[in-house]
Each structure stands twice: as structure tokens, then as C-alpha cells.
Amino acid sequence: MTKYIFVTGGVVSSLGKGITAASLGRLLKNRGLNVTIQKFDPYINVDPGTMSPYQHGEVFVTDDGAETDLDLGHYERFIDINLNKYSNVTTGKIYSSVLQKERRGEYLGGTVQVIPHITNEIKERVYRSGRETNADVVITEIGGTVGDIESLPFLEAIRQIKSDIGRDNVMYIHCTLIPYLKAAGEMKTKPTQHSVKELRSLGIQPNIIVVRTEMPVSQDMKDKLALFCDIDTKAVIEARDADTLYAVPLSLQEQNMDQIVCDHLKLDNPAADMTEWTALVEKVRNLSKKTKIALVGKYVELQDAYISVVEALRHAGYSFDTDVEVKWVNAEHVTAENVQELVGDTDGILVPGGFGDRGVEGKIVAIQYARENKVPFLGICLGMQLASIEFARNVLGLEGANSSEINPDTPYAIIDLLPEQKDVEDLGGTLRLGLYPCKLAEETNAYNAYNEPVVYERHRHRYEFNNQFRPDMEKAGFVFSGTSPDGRLVEIIELKDHPWFVAAQFHPELVSRPNRPQPLFHDFVRASITNKESK
């Protein structure tokens, strides 16, 4: 029978519930269990697809095209699984589904209420995740903080699941904070005690408490928490700030967290073999070289907006024994006069995805600098579109060339709407989303990176390269090295007379893994290291 683990949070948000859940998932997978994982977000948006990155951080896209929470990126990178649309559920999705059923008459004229209709829908999303993946263990992270009004239906639903399927099949893990008061010189357990009290008042008794802390937690403090929270002392797990995220699974294993989980859920699996993971962490901690990459974006104040890009750069660096330092460059501040000052000290330039016109001209200036100065360049999504526009303007001389998204009246729409998007009015969920094939041209940097004729990558865009400009740009040295299998949609572009200038319409960062870097990122970092060594 499938086992269910629920991870909740208390005291404050951003405690690392997602990393805790992902780390536990890795440990259980290495015990030979089939693990899947999902995130429940209590906000009323249907998904984060139309939310500002300042509000939510990165939108992570799954193979099947779901626009999801950035925690799913952590889940995929840690557990090395590909998640799906059932892996991220919001209040908006739950209510939308219930209201559609009510309109279809599925409730037989009954009064639709939070209990049982909303809670039943939530429970069905939990069970469906296990069914769709045939999982041995389903880990579900409940977003937000215990005590939030928005979280109540989710907490009630997971409380009911224990009654539905039995205590041996359900486990509750509560993540809290033990703050350190510098003035008093001591750590305080009271916020955790009150958070657990709040959770218990809702009918949920945690089986494990994971305490986030800056300082070591003494045995006396663990005993105190165990007493007041009514759990075993060994089930108080310390989650101290780590030098690398990838060390967290090893820390949890040292404290026998995965064994406690298996004992409670009656899972008789051998201990997790973390030999390869330990080697990875040792490598990360002992990188001997450095390279600096400029990330020119519009959301650089909130680095979570580009979290998968940064992780993909780091993964690529690991394979070259190199620590990749990211220099954050606000695209709005980049001009032709200061671009040398802002990116001249870097070994490679990356322009990531984005929407809207803010910061676009600064990105184009940075791209021109990379092209003219032979600096390795990687463009992603909007970065690929702007690389095409920069070439059209400054090499072909098409003054005013632009994207019809940025300037609908441009005389040269190098980037235009996909034909199927012309009459779409809704913004949410209507992009070209998910995994699509890309055919690579031989003897190109893209082909050399992948070493395969056809690859599959994840997309999230509405606009595409306008094919009427392909002949002229090809004549001028612009290479269309990746297209859709029918050749209609441009997927990857690069330059003939440049050591490494590649840009992709898709989002390669989404499939990178710490032990298996994404090929374009791998080759980009290699080119950046070569550039540094040649200076």
C-alpha cells in the first residue's frame, strides 16, 4: 500500500520545507523506494504562471507543461525524477474543480461546502499523485505556515487521510524555527512549542519535528521539545544552515531521519547507499577553480527568480572542478557606455528568460558586447529572441527591428506570435508549454554539446522567430542549429564566427541535475573557462 508523508511549516515561512522534503525523498529513493512528491500552495491563483517573479520566484515547468512552484525544481534536482501536473496543487485549482463539478450537477443538488467537498477534492489530489506514478511513498509539502487561514482546508484534509487509511500509512513532519537571540545569548524553543500546539489543535500530531537553526541544538533542548511536543527525542531533527544545499540529505541521514520514517511506516528497506551523493558533496566543497558568469536580468533583486539557472551553472561547474560565481547585472542599468564596466570582468554572459519590455535594451547591449568581443554567450528564451534582434539591428542593419511583444508597430518583427496564439485572450496556461523535440544540425556548437540528432527540452513561450528573416540572417552568418522536427520553429541559434555564442528558445536549466549537468550549460561553462584561461 502507498504510504503518505506530509510536511508542514510553522513559526515563519521560507524555513526550507521544500529542501527537507526533497532531501527525505532522496534518502527514501536510495533505499529502493519509488518516491513521488508534490507541493500544495494555499493561494487562490490557479498556478504561478501569471504571477510576478517578485511575488513567487521562478515558475518551474514540468514535462507535461504544468507551470509550478520553484520547489518542484528542488524536488527534481534532489530526487532525480520528472514530476507532472499532479505535483503542484493550489487552492485556485481545487476550487475551480469543485465549482465545475457543481455546475455539472455532480453533487446532486447538495450544498457545496469546505467540508466535505473541498477537503475531499484535496484528498483526491493526494491519492491521485500516488496512483499516477505507482509510488511506494508520496511526500506532500503544505505551503504556508500553520495558523494561516488559507492553509486550514489542506490541514483538515491531511488530518482526515490518517483516519481514512490508518496511522501506519501516514506520517506528519513539522518544520519550525528555533531563533537565537544574540542579546540574551540563548536559543528559544517557545515559538516551536506554540506552533506544534497550534497544529495539534487542528487534530494533527507531528511524528517528527525538524528545527531550523543557526546554532547547534543541545540534547537538553531536544529533550525539552520532545516533552512539550509529545514526540520521541530522536524525532527532533536539527536542520542547521548548510554550506551547500546538497549536504542536507547527509545531515538528515546522520540523524536517522529516514530510518525513523521507515520504522513508523512499517517499511522494511535496507539503509540508503549515499556513496555517490557523498562524493558529490565532497566535490562541491573542494572545488579548486573559479569562473565568473554575468547574469543580465530584470529580476536580479530576487535571485529566486533565476534559481534553476544558477543551479544549472553550478552543476556544470562541478564537472570541471570549478566554482561558478554569478555576477548579478540589472539589465535596466546596462548602457553602451557602461557595459564594459559591468560585464568586462566576467568570463561568460548569460541572458535568461523573461516577459515584457523592461530591461530589454540593456540586455541587447550586453548581447552585442558578447558578440563583438567574442565572450561566450548563452541566451535562454527571451535571451534567444533578443540575440536574434541584436543581430538583425547591428549586423543586417534593420533599424527598429524588435519583437511584436515589445513593440507591436516594429517595422521588422524578428520575433512574432506563434500562429496558434494570434486569437488567444487568456494569459494563464496558454503558452507553448512542456517538453518538445528539437532537431539539431550537425557540425554546430549545439550538436557538439548534446552529441545527439534529436533532443527533448521544456518550453514556456508565446512568441517565436519570424521565418521570413531566416534567409537573410543565414547569409550574414547566423546559424539555425536547432529546429522543430518539421523545421518550422526555430529552437536554437548560434553564430558562425564566434567561439561560443548559443541561444535556445526553450529552458535548458529546468532539466539540469547536480550529477548530470544539462549539455548546453556544460558546454557554456567549458567555453567560459577556456575564455578565462586565454586572457
UniProtKB/Swiss-Prot annotation:
Sequence positions that bind L-glutamine: 54, 354, 382-385, 405, 462
Binding site for UTP: 13, 188-193, 224
A cellular component term, taken from the record's GO annotations: cytosol
Binding site for Mg(2+): 71, 141
Domain Glutamine amidotransferase type-1 per the UniProt entry, residue ranges: 292-534
Keyword terms: ATP-binding, Glutamine amidotransferase, Ligase, Magnesium, Metal-binding, Nucleotide-binding, Pyrimidine biosynthesis
Gene Ontology BP annotations: 'de novo' CTP biosynthetic process; pyrimidine nucleobase biosynthetic process
Record field: catalytic activity: UTP + L-glutamine + ATP + H2O = CTP + L-glutamate + ADP + phosphate + 2 H(+); L-glutamine + H2O = L-glutamate + NH4(+); UTP + NH4(+) + ATP = CTP + ADP + phosphate + 2 H(+)
Annotated binding of CTP, by residue: 13, 148-150, 188-193, 224
Involved pathway(s): Pyrimidine metabolism; CTP biosynthesis via de novo pathway; CTP from UDP: step 2/2
Gene3D superfamilies noted in UniProt: 3.40.50.880, P-loop containing nucleotide triphosphate hydrolases (3.40.50.300)
Residues reported in the UniProt entry to bind ATP: 14-19, 71, 240-242
GO molecular function annotations of the record: ATP binding; CTP synthase activity; glutaminase activity; identical protein binding; metal ion binding
Assigned EC number: 6.3.4.2
Enzyme class: ligase
Stretch list, region Amidoligase domain: 1-267
Activity control: Allosterically activated by GTP, when glutamine is the substrate; GTP has no effect on the reaction when ammonia is the substrate. The allosteric effector GTP functions by stabilizing the protein conformation that binds the tetrahedral intermediate(s) formed during glutamine hydrolysis. Inhibited by the product CTP, via allosteric rather than competitive inhibition.
Keyword Nucleus: no
Matches recorded under NCBIfam families: PRK05380.1, PyrG
Extra remark: CTPSs have evolved a hybrid strategy for distinguishing between UTP and CTP. The overlapping regions of the product feedback inhibitory and substrate sites recognize a common feature in both compounds, the triphosphate moiety. To differentiate isosteric substrate and product pyrimidine rings, an additional pocket far from the expected kinase/ligase catalytic site, specifically recognizes the cytosine and ribose portions of the product inhibitor.
Quaternary state and interactors: Homotetramer.
Similarity field: Belongs to the CTP synthase family.
Function: Catalyzes the ATP-dependent amination of UTP to CTP with either L-glutamine or ammonia as the source of nitrogen. Regulates intracellular CTP levels through interactions with the four ribonucleotide triphosphates.
Protein name as annotated: CTP synthase
Provenance organism: Bacillus cereus (strain AH187)
